[in-house]
Amino acid sequence: MDIKDTLRFIRELWFFSILRDDELAELISKAEMRSYKAGEIIFNQGDKGDSFYIVYSGKIRVLRKDKNQAEINLGVMTRGDHFGETALISDKVRNATTRAAEDSILIAIGKEAFNKYIFSKP
């Protein structure tokens, strides 16, 4: 996947509309494309938050354990959906587990870049 495709995809997402083109290009240069196989965990409930994720392709299931440790399905994320920002903003642990429901590619933005380019904007 080349930078132009990634830039075009990210530019279409509403929460990146606040960024100038140069800021968006710099943010993308700091982002990582990560591949996950079906069934693979992206992060677990209780993990420390270190990245914000955007679904580029595939499906990601969001799960939470109840008080009896049974998994509750909270939903499915698809292309263009994002997740993981709550733990970055609140500086708390992840409140859910995310697992690839099928082979998926995610764009991962680390905490430092997230705070600089997204969270600090009005």
Regions found by a protein language model. Give the residues of each.
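Short solvent-exposed loop/turn micro-motifs enriched in small/polar/acidic residues
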Residues: 26-27, 45-47, 67, 80, ...
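Short, structured motif recognition centered on aromatic/hydrophobic residues
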Residues: 6, 15, 52, 106-107
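A short beta-strand-loop-beta hairpin characteristic of the jelly-roll/cupin
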Residues: 60-72
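Short, acidic, Ser/Thr-enriched surface-loop or helix-capping motifs
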Residues: 37, 55, 66, 77-78, ...
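Cytoplasmic (intracellular) domains, linkers, and terminal tails of multi-pass ion channels
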Residues: 1-9, 18, 26, 116
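Regulatory nucleotide-sensing modules
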Residues: 11-63
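Cyclic-nucleotide recognition modules
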Residues: 9-12, 73-122
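Non-catalytic, surface-exposed connector residues within folded enzymatic/regulatory domains
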Residues: 18-21, 71, 108
